[in-house]
């Protein structure tokens, strides 16, 4: 088997995790108590869904996941929620005091005490796997736990499981909406370790997803539940091919191979289509070309940055439902002729496609309509640098005055780490600039094309 272990860190990671596991259970017909009425081969571990669930002798399906937070309230909601019987109590790890939005607390003082327990639980899950493929790590980098403990866990996983892939689903601070004053510090400090210790990181930001909920689903005031259900659709689409058998399956390591041209250039944009409410879906015919066009729309991006400002290096299209390769090829050919979707000149093909015949599921009573086919795109675009430059700018404004720095130093961090992390990000922005400009010497004659 090619198992995958999910690690959910901090409030954001856990709440996204709840949405994901709710959706996985729905897709596989697993009840909230872990039983699976449709599973005839109880205890036989070669079903495709065993990548994400392990089976006990009594036929209970347990997610291969751990949830970690430095304070108990969010995890207590899982312990008392409707899926409380799904998880083994040891998979839910909570501390007593939180990281107080402070990277240094999550990484040095408070996080240090809990990290060995987490790794111990991960080890138990890993020992239960026959061929562990890698880790999915869910966290936000604005807070203290997601950024600090998230970085610490990634660093330790690199030591313990050096060769396994690590995919991060990372919620970045939004341009306008902020939940903490020190978000820029935490983000810069933890991006520093995301750079080194993840193989692919998918950037998400709440503001972009709010806008999608407002615009496409007509939800006036989206809640985190609305956002997380949308995020879970993306993550589900990415992992469909690991959990079901399909026509063109895409493995986690394949994502890496196809999306990451240089090791540092591994921050991805994601988009999903169709995001549509049930009332509208009734009147619209959503064909393969239509949904394919939709995922390239700047307004579909799940992070606030404009792909038209950059160039695509690669993109991965994961279709699910009633889709045949012929339609996909035609849709992709049309996209290639568009002036708005520009690829770097050193990567002429740039498309990796996957198809899975399992139609998308939606949570009953949720906002999304049940549709016949959907597509999720993960793309590597140089415009992602906008996200970093925005955060860097805010970081600089605060750090010039050394504002709030004493809270970090007081928890055992050294001031040098700030400048080191900031320089690393400056280098990253530069890397993106260069990747987008490669082959720029022959661009002088482009004006005559029109």
Swiss-Prot record:
Gene Ontology molecular-function annotations: GTP binding; hydrolase activity; metal ion binding; structural constituent of cytoskeleton
Matches recorded under InterPro entries: Alpha_tubulin, Beta-tubulin_BS, Tub_FtsZ_C, Tubulin, Tubulin/FtsZ-like_C, Tubulin/FtsZ_2-layer-sand-dom, Tubulin/FtsZ_GTPase_sf, Tubulin_C
Residues binding GTP, per UniProt: 11, 71, 144-145, 179, 206, 228
Disulfide bridge positions per record: none
Enzyme class: hydrolase
GO CC annotations on file: cytoplasm; microtubule
Locations listed in the record: Cytoplasm, Cytoskeleton
The keyword Magnesium is assigned to this record: yes
Enzyme Commission code: 3.6.5.-
Role of this protein: Tubulin is the major constituent of microtubules, a cylinder consisting of laterally associated linear protofilaments composed of alpha- and beta-tubulin heterodimers. Microtubules grow by the addition of GTP-tubulin dimers to the microtubule end, where a stabilizing cap forms. Below the cap, tubulin dimers are in GDP-bound state, owing to GTPase activity of alpha-tubulin.
Keyword match Hydrolase: yes
Catalytic activity entry: GTP + H2O = GDP + phosphate + H(+)
Assembly: Dimer of alpha and beta chains. A typical microtubule is a hollow water-filled tube with an outer diameter of 25 nm and an inner diameter of 15 nM. Alpha-beta heterodimers associate head-to-tail to form protofilaments running lengthwise along the microtubule wall with the beta-tubulin subunit facing the microtubule plus end conferring a structural polarity. Microtubules usually have 13 protofilaments but different protofilament numbers can be found in some organisms and specialized cells.
Catalytic site: 254
Top-rank taxon: Eukaryota
Residues binding Mg(2+), per UniProt: 71
Gene3D superfamilies the UniProt entry points to: Helix hairpin bin, Tubulin/FtsZ, C-terminal domain, Tubulin/FtsZ, GTPase domain
Alphabetical list of Pfam families matching this protein: Tubulin, Tubulin_C
Protein known as: Tubulin alpha-3 chain
Site (described: Involved in polymerization): 450
PTM field: Undergoes a tyrosination/detyrosination cycle, the cyclic removal and re-addition of a C-terminal tyrosine residue by the enzymes tubulin tyrosine carboxypeptidase (TTCP) and tubulin tyrosine ligase (TTL), respectively.
Gene Ontology biological process terms in this record: microtubule-based process
Keywords in alphabetical order: Cytoplasm, Cytoskeleton, GTP-binding, Hydrolase, Magnesium, Metal-binding, Microtubule, Nucleotide-binding
Obligatory cofactor(s): Mg(2+)
């Amino acid at each position: 088997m090619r198992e995958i272990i999910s690690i959910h860190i901090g409030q954001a990671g856990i709440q996204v995790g709840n949405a994901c596991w709710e959706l996985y259970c729905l897709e596989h017909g697993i009840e909230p108590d872990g039983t699976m009425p449709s599973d005839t081969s109880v205890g036989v571990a070669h079903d495709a869904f065993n990548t994400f669930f392990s089976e006990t002798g009594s036929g209970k399906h347990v997610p291969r996941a751990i949830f970690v937070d430095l304070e108990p309230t969010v995890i207590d909601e899982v312990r008392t929620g409707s899926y409380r019987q799904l998880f083994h109590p040891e998979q839910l790890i909570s501390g007593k005091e939180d990281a107080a939005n402070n990277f240094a607390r999550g990484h040095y003082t408070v996080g240090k005490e809990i990290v060995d327990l987490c790794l111990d639980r991960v080890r138990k899950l890993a020992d239960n796997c026959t061929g562990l493929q890698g880790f999915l790590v869910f966290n936000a980098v604005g807070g203290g736990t997601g950024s600090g403990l998230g970085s610490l866990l990634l660093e330790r996983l690199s030591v313990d499981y050096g060769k396994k892939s690590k995919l991060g689903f990372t919620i970045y601070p939004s341009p306008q909406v902020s939940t903490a004053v020190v978000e820029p510090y935490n983000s810069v400090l933890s991006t520093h370790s995301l750079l080194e210790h993840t193989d692919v990181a998918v950037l998400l930001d709440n503001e972009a997803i709010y806008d999608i909920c407002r615009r496409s689903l007509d939800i006036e005031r989206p809640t985190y539940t609305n956002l997380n259900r949308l995020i879970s659709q993306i993550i589900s689409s990415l992992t469909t091919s690991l959990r079901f058998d399909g026509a063109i399956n895409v493995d986690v390591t394949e994502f890496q191979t196809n999306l990451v041209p240089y090791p540092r250039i591994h921050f991805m944009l994601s988009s999903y289509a169709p995001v549509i409410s049930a009332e509208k879906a009734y009147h619209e015919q959503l064909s393969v070309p239509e949904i394919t066009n939709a995922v390239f729309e700047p307004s579909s991006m799940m992070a606030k940055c404009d792909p038209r400002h950059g160039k695509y290096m690669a993109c991965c299209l994961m279709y699910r439902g009633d889709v045949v390769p012929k339609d996909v090829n035609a849709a992709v050919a049309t996209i290639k002729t568009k002036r708005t979707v520009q690829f770097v000149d050193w990567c002429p093909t740039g498309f990796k496609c996957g198809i899975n015949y399992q139609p998308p599921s939606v949570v009953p009573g949720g906002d999304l309509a049940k549709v016949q086919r959907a597509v999720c795109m993960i793309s590597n675009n140089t415009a992602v640098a906008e996200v970093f430059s925005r955060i860097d700018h805010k970081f600089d404004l605060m750090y010039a005055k050394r504002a709030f720095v004493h809270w970090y130093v007081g928890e055992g961090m050294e001031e040098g780490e700030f400048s080191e992390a900031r320089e690393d990000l400056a280098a990253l922005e530069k890397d993106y600039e260069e990747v987008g400009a490669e082959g720029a010497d022959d661009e002088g004659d482009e004006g005559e094309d029109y």
